Swiss-Prot record:
<feature type="binding site">
    <location>
        <position position="166"/>
    </location>
    <ligand>
        <name>ATP</name>
    </ligand>
</feature>
<keyword id="KW-0460">Magnesium</keyword>
<dbReference type="Pfam" id="PF02110">
    <property type="entry name" value="HK"/>
</dbReference>
<keyword id="KW-0067">ATP-binding</keyword>
<dbReference type="InterPro" id="IPR029056">
    <property type="entry name" value="Ribokinase-like"/>
</dbReference>
<keyword id="KW-0808">Transferase</keyword>
<dbReference type="GO" id="GO:0009229">
    <property type="term" value="P:thiamine diphosphate biosynthetic process"/>
</dbReference>
<comment type="pathway">
    <text>Cofactor biosynthesis; thiamine diphosphate biosynthesis; 4-methyl-5-(2-phosphoethyl)-thiazole from 5-(2-hydroxyethyl)-4-methylthiazole: step 1/1.</text>
</comment>
<keyword id="KW-0784">Thiamine biosynthesis</keyword>
<dbReference type="InterPro" id="IPR000417">
    <property type="entry name" value="Hyethyz_kinase"/>
</dbReference>
<dbReference type="GO" id="GO:0009228">
    <property type="term" value="P:thiamine biosynthetic process"/>
</dbReference>
<keyword id="KW-0547">Nucleotide-binding</keyword>
<feature type="binding site">
    <location>
        <position position="119"/>
    </location>
    <ligand>
        <name>ATP</name>
    </ligand>
</feature>
<protein>
    <recommendedName>
        <fullName>Hydroxyethylthiazole kinase</fullName>
        <ecNumber>2.7.1.50</ecNumber>
    </recommendedName>
</protein>
<dbReference type="GO" id="GO:0004417">
    <property type="term" value="F:hydroxyethylthiazole kinase activity"/>
</dbReference>
<comment type="function">
    <text>Catalyzes the phosphorylation of the hydroxyl group of 4-methyl-5-beta-hydroxyethylthiazole (THZ).</text>
</comment>
<keyword id="KW-0479">Metal-binding</keyword>
């Protein structure tokens, strides 16, 4: 897909500011991923600065990975401000389905905010659609491509958003069309925060293209970077560092050569 390569160049030319209200586990790795790619991260969740910060950000990423009673109010306030300002909002419902707190928080944000992209694994997206038993902790317990296609389509229609269901094959839908992205590597599951980084990278691409193409661009670029990283470092610790390197090194030519993206009409 040519638009993925072009969006990579646009992103680096514009250096979008991505505001992340994310979890303690992944703040550092998420920021490094965005910096390596060519975006500017800010991790800001203080109530008193949200209005100013959201107003200057190119997009807002909300990640509920380390959710508690102190995180929820700034997430909700930022989502309301970003919706009013028509800024792209990307929601990562980490662990939805594992607990009622996570599921209900994600559902509340989906209900009142204008979410551009909902990105999660099979179990998380299934949970916000009311299908239980598919989440193990914050990891997906099972994955079936046909079910993932339907899940992505149904979530997009239900929440009037772009739904990205990630797994061995990623499926992205706006309810009218579906993209399948086959880039990536199983080693990503051995390093914490790779899904969260992907969500924030989608946030960066949301500053330069419409939601469905931003999601496809983010998943493709991160997936290719992971493939290239594993070729040089097949163990978790060095693999993580190499992913940063390839987020920095990836260019239009590599995207055009390595992208495995297919589009289907519904």
């Amino acid at each position: 897909m040519d638009f993925v390569a072009k969006n990579l160049t646009k992103l680096r030319e514009t250096n979008p500011l991505v505001q992340n209200i994310t979890n303690y586990v992944v703040m550092n790795s998420t920021a490094n991923s965005l910096l390596a790619l060519g975006a500017s991260p800010v991790m800001a969740h203080a109530m008193d600065e949200l209005e100013e910060m959201v107003s200057i950000a190119s997009s807002l990423v909300i990640n509920i990975g380390t959710l508690d009673e102190y995180w929820i109010p700034p997430m909700e306030k930022a989502a309301k401000i970003a919706s009013d300002l028509k800024k792209p909002i990307i929601l990562d419902p980490v662990g939805a389905g594992a607990t009622k707190l996570r599921t209900n928080t994600a559902l509340k944000i989906l209900d009142f905010a204008d979410i551009s992209v909902l990105r999660g694994n099979f179990g998380e997206i299934a949970a916000v659609l009311g299908e239980h038993g598919k989440t193990k902790g914050v990891d997906s317990a099972a994955y079936d491509s046909n079910e993932a296609i339907e899940l992505s389509k149904n979530a997009a229609k239900e929440f009037n958003t772009v739904s990205a269901v990630t797994g061995p094959i990623d499926y992205v839908s706006n309810g009218k069309e579906i993209y399948a992205i086959s880039n990536g590597h199983p080693m990503l599951s051995k390093v914490t925060g790779t899904g969260c980084a992907t969500t924030s990278i989608i946030g960066a691409f949301s500053a330069v293209d419409e939601p469905i193409k931003a999601a496809v661009s983010g998943l493709t670029v991160y997936g290719i970077s992971a493939e290239m990283a594993f070729g040089e470092a097949p163990y978790p610790g060095t693999f993580q560092a190499k992913v940063y390197d390839w987020l920095y090194r990836i260019d239009e030519e590599l995207v055009l050569e390595k992208a495995k993206v297919n589009k289907f009409e519904i």
